[in-house]
A protein has these predicted regions:
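A metal-dependent, Asp-based hydrolase signature
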Residues: 34-65
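Alpha-helical elements of Rossmann-like donor-binding domains used by nucleotide-donor carbohydrate transfer enzymes
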Residues: 7-11, 32, 46, 50, ...
């Protein structure tokens, strides 16, 4: 799922006139109340109430939801095809720093792309449900334990170097995907290397 932090910030400013957006969302998008929402420490209603208290008069909970949805761009068609192909050969799991406001939007984007989350992924691990954020070792260790395979039989891919470093520190093999590069080539090379070992 591709993200657009700046569009999300713009939506918070335009729809809500919310002045603290730069304090809670950045390239890692997990600070302050946003981080608490994604870690499951704040409910969606609590988050919306806090945001609305700092927004223009007349702003609504739906305005908050709409502004939040602007962080999500969608899934590139080649990535959709890649996920379909990989799911035929491997068990796929999603590890996502996510929240109960954005999840319905992102799940809808997967559905529209023809790859519903429950069909393409064996299981999804969402930070707000796990009460832990990537790159915390707690997050990765819980995932490893729940999947039940030796960690060396797994491969974690992320577009955040911090998340990759956190996974490696927790004993999970991981590779960094630089947004805008060819994910398919990176994955195929990594999987080929694993088969040789």
């Amino acid at each position: 799922m591709d993200l657009d932090i700046e569009d999300c910030k713009r939506a918070f400013r335009q729809k809500l006139d919310y002045g603290q957006i730069d304090e809670i969302i950045d390239a890692c998008h997990q600070r302050g109340i946003y981080g608490e929402l994604e870690e499951g420490l704040l409910s969606a209603d609590e988050f919306r109430s806090i945001v609305l208290a700092g927004s223009r008069p007349g702003a609504t909970a739906e305005d908050v939801n709409e502004a939040m949805s602007h962080i999500l761009v969608g899934i590139e068609p080649y990535k959709v095809q890649l996920l379909k192909e990989l799911s035929q050969e491997y068990d796929l799991y999603m590890l996502s720093n996510n929240n109960p406001i954005c999840l319905p939007y992102s799940a809808g984007m997967f559905e529209q792309a023809g790859i519903p989350l429950e069909k393409i992924f064996r299981k999804c691990f969402f930070s707000y449900q796990m009460k832990a954020l990537k790159p915390s070792p707690v997050f990765y260790k819980a995932v490893i334990n729940e999947i039940g395979l030796p960690s060396e039989e797994m491969l974690f891919i992320d577009d955040s170097r911090k998340n990759v470093d956190g996974a490696i520190a927790a004993g999970l093999p991981a590779i960094y995907y630089e947004p805008g590069t060819d994910l398919a080539a990176l994955l195929h090379a990594a999987l080929k290397k694993e088969e040789v070992c």
